[in-house]
């Protein structure tokens, strides 16, 4: 076999001829060149002969003179074969068969053979004994990339791989032994295959045509322009050897040679195609480009698929104008790879067809060399469906930091892709050579960039090709959506102004009902002019239509309605982490403690009423004594400490009860306005007579407590020389002393643990978290039944005189009196333990000097 340097394969050898123009006949008397006249007549005859060939006009226009002659001879030989093969018998020449022949001619007009070729997974190939392609069907282009006119009457060895040429020659011989031929051995070593066989067989030397060993089935590799890996495609040949009639060949002596055997086979790809390849194999088209991808030619199928004529395709400039903006960089990467390696590989992108339609194609481009230099590009495209294109787009590996298709880089909504400093310099011409006229243009135009650049191709594209026509029956209007947004903004403004959550919910429900009523009118009333609306196009691309908007509005309405119905339930999103979680825990502890202390409230109440009656008698005896004149000062100081608590905001805890204002003889109620409990429902049960208090004190845990006795007298008894006092709830100035909670005056009466009367110990209300060493809770109040004025109690000091009291305070140092450290927290009464004694002489409150409150 010859070396690899002498091996050549089939390639496109055709070149586009110069367009022929009809020249006028010269006038008489003017001399003309006889050889030129001869060439002109020859060209005219060749053009007329080419027009008779059974090929499309675009193929005929690209044929050279030798190709026209070659195809003409091949056509005549094929016609001779069919004339002999289909020749009827002498019995058929009777007149009775003429009508059947006429019907056959009518059936032939249906082009049934073309449909059979399309349904066939392969192409038909007829090869003579001297290895010339006698016939190849037009479907060879779908598998090998060669057109029918490229291979007919050419050597078949130009298509076969060098390692498979010997096997193909063996299959052409009827006995599978081509070595019997004298000159066949040297033929395979030649560059273009073996020469014409020197031995011809007579029918007596050959077996019958229908013999079983005349069948052939073998495999070999054929040259393929569509393959992107090896350049060869493994094909399976299945057929038989048959006589090739009507060739009328003559031998060296001039004698007519008998018909010789030829291989009639069907070549199918060894790897079966997929369903999609079977469906789209007949739509493969090819385009020819310059090295900068400017199209310079397109075949008939490409014009049919894209809708352009060859003139329209070749006069637009850069081929990137026909590529989608999201695929330009991807195609440019394949273009650079093709320039470096000679082949681009399979590239999937979108091509712009006529009437602003995008077609997904799978393309493979190759460099074609001439004289050792790249000359042009041949690109083979196979149309894809939209589903296949989207699948390839998802699999595409994006090496760039952004992607055009997702909207991250807007190409058509900006005035300039560069900053003013980076504006490209204009091309200086004769008209702007002067300095005063020369200035950089800030606005990019088609002339601002290189004609073959990607940016120039993007600017030259029309923006309308990326706008999809509206097709949804329920369009959207921007005015409607903007109105919804404005109404949503008004909801937020009203909510910020009122601060009421219920008002917000009511407003949302009302608005949702109005929108649903508006939507019930139909799209024709809401969206009269919106077919060309950009917002509508965007919503249509997102798959949102009229029914989706209606369902979203209904969803919002039902969600708001259910929220309003469940307003009394606890919403964990509204819980304040710093304050209300502690309140929730405290409520849980209260509920567990109240169950244990409920059984003890009734005997305590009865015992307290007896003690209050005894205390009332003692206080009436003290009314006769003369009170000291400075008794009013501590009373006023105590009231000033209480009054600032009346100005607390609605966030703080309020007691669902009423206090008595202080009058001299009959106790007058302390009218505190009852406010709604917004967040805290801890003391909502303080309306009954048997009040439940949350905490039980620990015995012997308090170092010191004062003994006091409850009474049924007013809180501040009036003395003989004092005037009546009435303390309004909000007319006092704030005191400089630490403020206390209102709950200090609603503390329960404390009962000792071990008492001779047999009364069970009752827990007092626990105070909050801080202790103050300089103040004492002097009064405790218990709410009466059915919102009646509470009975007031008075502390009685066991040590006579204020100085003794102060000395005891200073000696002990620590009291169990507690006050709230934060106004936002809930105040409680002081926790005390000890024994109650019936005092013989109880000193009134004015004996306590103000020094105890410093």
UniProtKB/Swiss-Prot annotation:
Residues 440-452 have a biased composition (Polar residues). A motif (Nuclear localization signal 2) lies at residues 36-41. Residues 346-387 form the PAC domain. Signal peptide: none annotated. A motif (Nuclear localization signal 1) lies at residues 12-15. The keyword Protein biosynthesis does not apply. Residues 111-175, 270-340 form the PAS domain. It is found in: Cytoplasm; Nucleus. It comes from the Eukaryota. Residues 1-9 form a propeptide. Residues 37-65 are annotated as: DNA-binding. Keywords: Activator, ADP-ribosylation, Biological rhythms, Cell cycle, Cytoplasm, DNA-binding, Nucleus, Receptor, Repeat, Repressor, Transcription, Transcription regulation. GO terms for cellular component: cytoplasm; nuclear aryl hydrocarbon receptor complex; nucleus. Residues 1-38, 425-452 are annotated as: Disordered. The keyword Cytoplasm applies. GO terms for molecular function: E-box binding; nuclear receptor activity; protein heterodimerization activity; protein homodimerization activity; sequence-specific double-stranded DNA binding. Residues 26-79 form the bHLH domain. GO terms for biological process: cellular response to 2,3,7,8-tetrachlorodibenzodioxine; cellular response to 3-methylcholanthrene; circadian regulation of gene expression; negative regulation of DNA-templated transcription; negative regulation of T cell mediated immune response to tumor cell; positive regulation of DNA-templated transcription; positive regulation of transcription by RNA polymerase II; regulation of adaptive immune response. Mono-ADP-ribosylated, leading to inhibit transcription activator activity of AHR. Residues 49-81, 116-124, 264-266 are annotated as: Required for maintaining the overall integrity of the AHR:ARNT heterodimer and its transcriptional activity. Homodimer. Heterodimer; efficient DNA binding requires dimerization with another bHLH protein. Interacts with ARNT; the heterodimer ARNT:AHR binds to core DNA sequence 5'-TGCGTG-3' within the dioxin response element (DRE) of target gene promoters and activates their transcription. Binds MYBBP1A. Interacts with coactivators including SRC-1, RIP140 and NOCA7, and with the corepressor SMRT. Interacts with NEDD8 and IVNS1ABP. Interacts with BMAL1. Interacts with HSP90AB1. Interacts with TIPARP; leading to mono-ADP-ribosylation of AHR and subsequent inhibition of AHR. The PAS 1 domain is essential for dimerization and also required for AHR:ARNT heterodimerization. Ligand-activated transcription factor that enables cells to adapt to changing conditions by sensing compounds from the environment, diet, microbiome and cellular metabolism, and which plays important roles in development, immunity and cancer. Upon ligand binding, translocates into the nucleus, where it heterodimerizes with ARNT and induces transcription by binding to xenobiotic response elements (XRE). Regulates a variety of biological processes, including angiogenesis, hematopoiesis, drug and lipid metabolism, cell motility and immune modulation. This is Aryl hydrocarbon receptor. The gene is Ahr.
